[in-house]
Amino acid sequence: MSSNNIKLKYDSGNILSKDVHSIGIIALGSHRENHGAALPIDTDSKIAANVALNVATKTGATFLGIFYGATEYDYIKHGHHLKKDDLVNKQIIPQLINIKKQLNIKSVIIVNGHGGNNLIIEDIDKISKKTELKIIFNNSIIESEGPHACTGELSMGAVLGITDMTSLKEHENFIKHPEVGMVGLKEARDNEPIINKEALTIEKEGFEVNMILGQDMLENAQKEIINEVKKLL
């Protein structure tokens, strides 16, 4: 018997609605980007994927995994990134077209965990048109995380088990790890006043690991995206 003849039980399980399966949740992070001594190079991807999976688990929306690419502003140099157009045209659009074809998805929420990916916001309408999908770009993670590889990411990372607590002192070495707070990234600080302001704060006040804060940040991001799922039903 052909698998196409199998009637799927869309109303089974602990889900918001049988229609929730038409909503996809996919993470967009950055897999190869320095985060000091205490966080791994794929911190953004791990945080975004965790939030995306938890939202899919709690709502029943279809978990679509993660995009493999990321982009970045040309004045921020702390990792390996794609040009924005390559990310959009060679990674995101083809992957979403395949997702729609295979799973009959109608809407996709992109859970963003990397600030540089904000460059693609101007292309969301294009992505939607090319893929024939409703696209929602959610920034709930990065809107609250603060300076790069500092308190926000360290705290969320600690909750997830990816922060190396034994390396926090080494993490403070801005000469060896200039990307932490972007303290040592002169070009980034010269080009973006907000980055410079945050870097000055980190130089003066440092950072901390706060498990309660990290848990709250992860849960608040999930709650915001869950509300987006509900709006789509």
Swiss-Prot record:
UniProt remark on cofactor binding: Requires one Fe(2+) ion for activity. Requires an additional second metal ion that could be Fe(2+) or Zn(2+).
Function in brief = Catalyzes the hydrolysis of the formamide of 2-amino-5-formylamino-6-ribosylamino-4(3H)-pyrimidinone 5'-monophosphate (FAPy) to form 2,5-diamino-6-ribosylamino-4(3H)-pyrimidinone 5'-phosphate (APy).
Q: Which domain of life is it from?
A: Archaea
Q: Which family does it belong to?
A: Belongs to the creatininase superfamily. FAPy deformylase family.
Which UniProt keywords are listed? Hydrolase, Iron, Metal-binding, Zinc
| Gene3D superfamilies named among the record's database cross-references | Creatininase (3.40.50.10310)
Q: What InterPro entries does this protein map onto?
A: Creatininase-like_sf, Creatininase/forma_Hydrolase, FAPy_deformylase
Q: What is its EC number?
A: 3.5.1.102
According to UniProt, this protein's pathway is: Cofactor biosynthesis; coenzyme F420 biosynthesis; Cofactor biosynthesis; riboflavin biosynthesis
Keyword Iron attributed: yes
**A Gene Ontology molecular-function term?**
ferrous iron binding
Q: What is this protein called?
A: 2-amino-5-formylamino-6-ribosylaminopyrimidin-4(3H)-one 5'-monophosphate deformylase
Binding sites annotated in the UniProt record for Fe cation 1: 33, 44, 114
Where Fe cation 2 binds, per the record, is at 35, 44
Q: Which reaction does it catalyse?
A: 2-amino-5-formylamino-6-(5-phospho-D-ribosylamino)pyrimidin-4(3H)-one + H2O = 2,5-diamino-6-(1-D-ribosylamino)pyrimidin-4(3H)-one 5'-phosphate + formate + H(+)
- Name the gene: arfB
Record the organism.
Methanosphaera stadtmanae (strain ATCC 43021 / DSM 3091 / JCM 11832 / MCB-3)
- Report any one BP term from Gene Ontology: F420-0 metabolic process
